[in-house]
């Protein structure tokens, strides 16, 4: 039985390039727009000398601040620094990634200091932004969330995402797979339809790719098989375009743009061109002074773009074949193909999928950018104990994406839970010792599909000691694997003769954050949030002073006022305004109380003069804001029925 939570639970799609948040309200999902009015938020964080920017504000200044604007954190989360994919990605990034204990960290200059952040911390900043977006819309604190991950994320990547939620101050109710969330978005309103439906979710996003095959019947969503590539998406298509134009620039101008200093503006132009080519056959790129004062004007056709990415596009069909094979299903047994993720707007991708299924048209009934957050919001409502009829009987049965097992003698991988096993799942097997009088056993836990453990991914290990002396193969050691609904694994081992046991939650010791590190990062996240709020109020105070000074100046320049003001008063006030504006020019990074103090000083000069002027004139002169409020706002109108704002042509 689900208990009712103290605050609303939201669904967050934490994407490689864009993130999205939704909430279940009034019997439907509401996708929440951010402070810029956009329903998706760029997964970007920018660091400057004075502030931290998240989302649209960060992406908008990336060309001016490429070395300190970080994105693509999802491509690093839960990975090791020496991973081939991490090393390959680093060639395309303008920011710096450093190695600390085999873990990749982002390095930036922030407020004049060199700072490093883990991918979890960075992701927590995006999650915090989504949390604040939801709080602004709901008008209440948000403490609980369902966060989505690619179906093919491994155990350490899932754990790291959960840690990011904790750093953001969120209770992560559950980690769910993106294609499964999208399936909920597709199938929620189809619960009433009779019969079983086989639905293939084809989810190609900014940096990851998943395919899941589900059976939907009477509100039960059962995943039959899943496959994918956690390193394939729009970013890779952008990289192909960037490389193409770097070569073209080199041919035309004999200048090499490659390397760390590759202009960010070219990448932004390539991203825009790629989007345009989804609806146009050709597009042009025009960048003034791209490199060493050289303007770069060129064009590209859709056919050329498709040729540049042909192998990447074709590779999306491999996981489709794999899920059909694993689910033992023929192509013609798939009733619906649902496209999810912005990259599925590419016509070539749509055609490849359609051709693969013998001309069957994919279903485009759901918004590819919002479907995952939509499904996560529904799951959040269920876990939060929402009583709505629409979500009451909905049941999700997901699968383990990779086989989980232990190493046995000779480095052999012995799976306990095979891939595509429905989760939650529990499986136990009995093992024994290999040598005479062996006092203990080392349980090494792996995930992967290869026969030898050295070719698979080591998740963690622990020892079971104190086994009584005995010949080999006599002691009985029961190893149990327990995979929760999050896809996160717990392993225990017990010696049946002594009942001595040991267990671990797989924490991937090499890569996972410790409890202490998470607590430290939570405190730091709070500190950065406080600094962001202080920066916002400082800017507000600066803007308030600036607009007050300029409003005063405009008043003095008004002919109707100038003729009625004493010359000495006018000179005094003009001098005070000039001094304030001059002080502002030299104090752009002042403290909030400095701006407030300066405004009080200026008010001290202006208020007596303006009061004297208005008293002599018997009220505010025509066309003037009477009373002249320090903020520059007009006073309350005497006639409250009339308009309070006057239109200015």
Curated annotation (Swiss-Prot):
Return the annotated region ranges for Disordered: 617-649
Whether ATP-binding counts among this entry's keywords is yes
Which keywords does this chain's UniProt record carry? ATP-binding, Chaperone, Nucleotide-binding
Query: One Pfam family for this entry, by name?
Result: HSP70
Low complexity: bias regions: 638-649
Superkingdom of source: Eukaryota
Q: Name one GO molecular function term.
A: ATP binding
Q: Does the keyword Nucleotide-binding apply?
A: yes
The UniProt similarity line reads:
Belongs to the heat shock protein 70 family.
Put simply, this protein is called Heat shock 70 kDa protein
């Amino acid at each position: 039985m689900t208990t009712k939570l103290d605050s609303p639970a939201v669904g967050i799609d934490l994407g490689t390039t864009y993130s999205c948040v939704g909430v279940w309200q009034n019997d439907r999902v509401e996708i929440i727009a951010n402070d810029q009015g956009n329903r998706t938020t760029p997964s970007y964080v920018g660091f400057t000398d004075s502030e931290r920017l998240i989302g649209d504000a960060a992406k908008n200044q990336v060309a001016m601040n490429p070395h300190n604007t970080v994105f693509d954190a999802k491509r690093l989360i839960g990975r090791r620094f020496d991973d081939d994919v991490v090393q390959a990605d680093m060639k395309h990034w303008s920011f710096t990634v450093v190695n600390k204990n085999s873990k990749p960290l982002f390095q930036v200059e922030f407020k004049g200091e060199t700072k490093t952040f883990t991918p979890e911390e960075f992701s927590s900043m995006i999650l915090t932004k989504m949390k604040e977006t939801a709080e602004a819309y709901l008008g209440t604190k948000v403490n609980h969330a369902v966060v989505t991950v690619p179906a093919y994320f491994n155990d350490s990547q899932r754990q790291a995402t959960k840690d990011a939620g904790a750093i953001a101050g969120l209770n992560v109710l559950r980690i769910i797979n993106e294609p499964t969330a999208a399936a909920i978005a597709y199938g929620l309103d189809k619960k009433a339809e009779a019969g079983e439906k086989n639905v293939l979710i084809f989810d190609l996003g900014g940096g990851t790719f998943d395919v899941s095959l589900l059976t939907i019947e009477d509100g039960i969503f059962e995943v039959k098989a899943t496959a994918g590539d956690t390193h394939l998406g729009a970013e890779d298509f952008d990289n192909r375009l960037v490389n193409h134009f770097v070569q073209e620039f080199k041919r035309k101008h004999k200048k090499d743009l490659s390397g760390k200093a590759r202009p960010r503006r070219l990448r932004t132009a390539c991203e825009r061109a790629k989007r345009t080519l989804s609806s146009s056959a050709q597009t042009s790129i025009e960048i003034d002074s791209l490199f060493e004062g050289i303007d770069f004007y060129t064009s590209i056709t859709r056919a050329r773009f498709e040729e540049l990415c042909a192998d990447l596009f074709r590779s999306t069909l491999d996981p489709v074949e794999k899920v059909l094979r694993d689910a033992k299903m023929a192509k013609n047994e798939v009733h619906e193909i649902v496209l999810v993720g912005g990259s599925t707007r590419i016509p070539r991708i749509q055609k490849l999928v359609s051709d693969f299924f013998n001309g069957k048209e994919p279903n485009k009934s759901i918004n590819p950018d919002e479907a995952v957050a939509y499904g996560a919001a529904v799951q959040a409502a269920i876990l939060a104990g929402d009583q709505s009829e629409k979500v009451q009987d909905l049941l999700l049965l997901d699968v383990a994406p990779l086989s989980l097992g232990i190493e046995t003698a000779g480095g052999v991988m012995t799976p306990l839970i095979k891939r595509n096993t429905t989760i939650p799942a529990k499986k136990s097997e009995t093992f024994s010792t290999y040598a005479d009088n062996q006092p203990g056993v080392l349980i090494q836990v792996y995930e992967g599909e290869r026969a030898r453990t050295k070719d698979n991914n080591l998740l963690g290990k622990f020892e079971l000691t104190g086994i009584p002396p005995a010949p080999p193969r006599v002691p009985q050691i029961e190893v149990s694997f327990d995979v929760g609904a999050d896809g996160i694994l717990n392993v225990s081992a017990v010696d049946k003769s002594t009942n001595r046991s040991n267990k671990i939650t797989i924490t991937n010791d090499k890569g996972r954050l410790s409890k202490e590190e998470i607590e430290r990062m939570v405190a730091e996240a709070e500190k950065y949030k406080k600094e962001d709020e202080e920066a916002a109020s400082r800017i507000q105070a600066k803007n308030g002073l600036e607009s007050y000074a300029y409003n005063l100046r405009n008043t003095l320049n008004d002919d109707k006022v100038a003729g009625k003001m004493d010359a000495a008063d006018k000179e005094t006030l003009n001098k005070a305004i000039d001094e304030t504006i001059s002080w502002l020019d030299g104090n752009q990074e002042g403290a909030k109380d400095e701006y407030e103090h300066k405004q009080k000083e200026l008010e001290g000069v202006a208020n007596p003069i303006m009061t004297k002027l208005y008293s002599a004139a018997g009220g505010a002169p025509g066309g003037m804001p009477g009373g002249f409020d320090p903020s520059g706002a007009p006073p309350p109108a005497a006639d409250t029925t009339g308009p309070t704002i006057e239109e200015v042509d």
